[in-house]
Amino acid sequence: MGQKVHPLGFRVGLNGNYKSKWFVKPKDYSLLLFQDYLIRKNIFNYFNILNNSKNKKNLLDSINITDIKINRKFDQVYIDIYVASMNKVIFNTSGSNSDPLIKIQSNKIVDQLQRVLLKQVSSFNLGNKKVNNSSKIIVNIIESPDINTNAVFIAKCLIDDLENRVPFRRALKTILDTTQKQKNLAGVKIQISGRLNGIEMARSEWVREGRIPLQTLTANIGYYNDVAETKYGLLGVKVWVYKNKS
């Protein structure tokens, strides 16, 4: 049997960077690593609650997180949240031409999120260790560029269609038609596993357009996997994208 390596971890230091950047003494490493886990978990939970409260009609009405990067400097924690959304309310705006109402709503979301994170991670125990209570959390929400070539957003679009009972072949065709129009995308591969279209026997189906050179370390590969919760059970979704070098 072939052994598969994670496409992103395989390329850290070449085409990708670590999601968390900080240095700490070895005895405190597990503590901060667990704190990073709590930060990411609470961010996803916060935006899930926010999306559900908006009664979204489709995926474009929701706020989809594509990446979370954490940087630490002394007692400050900088969190960059990359999101894909058509709703400009969530983005930090600047300049004289910006709508004051958008600024207020954007700042309100950031302030609420900072309070939630500070409350959840400012004080917890891991064995006999305690985290520093004086940590300051600074959240920045950034619009994710080129969402149609982002593996996370492509997977979210497919999952949204599958959960809305769109036949999987039609959903795949719609996504491939969109990705083929992207000039900076050299290839895309999508795999779905489970009870496709409600058939009793589970199976896997995959499609590919262009090239996906997984063994080439210098290739700019994006990858994401998630599950779709359907009436007939869970469907596993995996997406690989290969972007041209800019």
Swiss-Prot record:
Which compartment or compartments is the protein found in? Plastid, Chloroplast
Keyword annotations of the record:
Chloroplast, Plastid, Ribonucleoprotein, Ribosomal protein, RNA-binding, rRNA-binding
Any one of the GO BP annotations: translation
Lineage, top-rank taxon, reads: Eukaryota
The record's GO molecular-function terms, alphabetically, read:
rRNA binding; structural constituent of ribosome
Query: Which portions of this protein are annotated as coiled-coil regions?
Result: none
The cross-references to SUPFAM superfamilies, in alphabetical order and at most eight, read: Prokaryotic type KH domain (KH-domain type II) (SSF54814), Ribosomal protein S3 C-terminal domain (SSF54821)
Which Pfam families does this one have? Ribosomal_S3_C (PF00189)
HAMAP family recorded for this chain?
Answer: Ribosomal_uS3_B
Subunit note: Part of the 30S ribosomal subunit.
- Which family is this protein grouped under? Belongs to the universal ribosomal protein uS3 family.
Could you identify this protein by its name? Small ribosomal subunit protein uS3c
- Gene this protein is translated from: rps3
